[in-house]
Amino acid sequence: MPPRRAQAPGAPLLPVLALLPLLLGAGPQSGCLASPVSAAPLPAPGPCASQPCRNGGVCTPRSVTDQEHPAADAEPRYSCTCPAGVSGTYCQFVADPCASNPCHHGNCSSSSSSSSDSYLCICNDGYEGLNCEQPLPSIPTSGWTESTAPRQLQPVPATQEPDIILPRSQATVTLPTWQPKTGQKVVEMKWDQVEVVPDVACGNASSNNSAGGRLVSFEVPQNTSVKIRQDANSLLILLWKVTATGFQQCSLIDGRSVTPLQAPGGLVLLEEMLALGPNHFIGFVNDSVAKSIVALRLTLVVKASNCVPGDSHSNDLECSGKGKCATKPSEATFSCTCQDQYIGTFCEEFDACQRKPCQNEASCIDANEKQDGSNFTCLCLPGYTGELCQSKIDYCVLDPCRNGATCVSSLSGFTCQCLEGYFGSACEEKVDPCMSSPCQNNGTCYVDGVHFTCSCSPGFTGPTCAQLVDFCALSPCAHGMCRSVGTSYKCLCDPGYHGLYCEEEYNECLSAPCLNAATCRDLINGYECVCLAEYKGTHCELYKDPCANISCLNGGTCDSEGLNGTCICAPGFTGEECDIDINECDSNPCHHAGTCLDQPNGYTCHCPHGWVGANCEIHLQWKSGHMAESLTNMPRHSLYIIIGALCVAFILMLIILIVGICRISRIEYQGSSRPAYEEFYNCRSIDSEFSNAIASIRHARFGKKSRPAMYDVTPIAYEDYSPDDKPLVTLIKTKDL
């Protein structure tokens, strides 16, 4: 007979078996069903009785020697031998999910899900369940009603998706009942409050997708069955276990139907149906698969449990019955949250010290008596006593102090305050003031009642002769510092003094250190030379140069006649250091409204129009009216002769003047008229203010400079003006040429 898939609802019996009663509520609450009470005590099961090895692993109890090993309390009392492809302490890690042959009556096929332990069992006829471990029950022969829904949806596409065939519903059909096993752990999940996600668009019925539904996530410990509790309004549902992708997409592709067990008030998903990690389920109310209405989307997250010891029996309580086995979404395992006053990994120890019964900062030590013990011991700090260290010890109650001493009790004991003349921890001994030899440095001790007196040796003083006599207290050194030396002293004299008491002063002038008839004046630890006026230096050894400290500026020289130096200034400067420039313009040397420009050792006059000379004293006269009258009365032919003669004479004079000047004269220039001098010196026509230029002309004789030309030049005659209103030279005569 050919095999079939465990989740395919194609067989007419599967919809009946898949109808599940479910209460649609939320908020998981956990609880445990009580184990059946045996009539007689059962023998303690072995470490492998609970079948701890998964995925076909073989459990082997450890030997007694291994169990007595110091680390045995932290390790299981058994070992698992895992088949090929499976690893882990409990054979919980499956590299190939089909390597352990999880399908009892069918073939295993690895799922395309991203989870490494996902597989799909294709069951043989007559079996179903997650691992094809459940035989199909017999089919009832009566009580069936015809469904009003269509017989089948659209044709199944070639994607190997399971067919969704509407079942015939039978109200009286019941699921297999649940019979609790001894020691079986069950968590009850109620559906009073759930997160409703209405109308989630996941697809349509033709692609075997569904939409909407209640979205619930619940966490359970490993090896624990889940009881889904229902209320009066719940309906039987069809439950499918799907992959993570199918769960997100509300798709039944790669899913399989599961058959929970009917229990009083709900449905039970056995622990064999749940693998470590998330387990995703999609449930439908009655025949809602045909209508694509999801009634429930459930995620059961199975986590490893650390709530019972590894060597515990199947009927051992989680967290020793003194705590709650709980987890958080951020945690990977279930662990114990102990009740008040219980501690330990499994809440196995009653902590009698948790409430801090010991007083006065005493240390509490809990007696290791497991859960039934409530004994503890208080270790009191010094000074306290009592079962809870609540009382302070009075060490003076027995009056330990003698001879009238006062007893003072403290946390560390008692102290006796002795009367004068007694000593000891209890003031039991009489004081001998000289017994301890209080007098030092060979001093003699004398008893004086309860006191003593010391007679000191020479050189020592003080109540116990411990101090040297301070010989320097009377300041015996006149000009020095006193230093105690043993039983005497020594004077360290200041510079310039000597003697036993530093009372004598040295006279440094006895060596005649001053030169050149200087006077020596004795000082303390030194001398001073008073020099004559012309000498200086520490010993008056240097002759004074009066010009050494005088600085004459602007070319001035120092005259060192006598004891004083005097600056002889260059022309144009004055002052003690020749630092004052004489302003020659103060005397107004420029005539006829000429402008004076002060210069070092001189001045320059800028003359107005019609005046020339060093001081603008030469007047240039132009007689145009007289010449015009003479020319008018003169005959025309004579006029032409005169004009021609004058032109020839002018040209000859000009040639002679230029040649003479170019041969023998060098013209220097200064101030703002330098361009005019340069043109005249280079034998070019004059094109500048000649009146200002002529005032500064100098001449040279045979290449040597002479005095200013204004002292040698004769008056100048002008005959005509140029078009730009500047005169033309006709004759310049000089002396001594």
Swiss-Prot record:
Main localization, broad class: membrane
Classification via SUPFAM superfamilies: EGF/Laminin, Growth factor receptor domain
The keyword Phosphoprotein appears for this protein: yes
Designated name of the protein: Delta and Notch-like epidermal growth factor-related receptor
Domain of life: Eukaryota
Signal peptide interval: 1-25
Residue stretches spanning the membrane: 641-661
Domain EGF-like: 44-92, 94-133, 309-348, 349-390, 392-428, 430-466, 468-503, 505-541, 543-579, 581-617
Residues bearing the modification Phosphothreonine: 714
Tissue and organ distribution: Specifically expressed in brain neurons (at protein level).
Location of region: Interaction with AP1G1 and somatodendritic targeting: 677-680
CDD domains hit by this protein: EGF_CA (cd00054)
Glycosylation sites: 204, 564
Role this protein plays: Mediates neuron-glia interaction during astrocytogenesis. May promote differentiation of Bergmann glia during cerebellar development by activating DELTEX-dependent NOTCH1 signaling.
Deletion phenotype: Mice show no obvious abnormality and no apparent survival disadvantage. However, they have delayed cerebellar histogenesis and exhibit motor discoordination at adult stages.
UniProt feature coiled coil, ranges: none
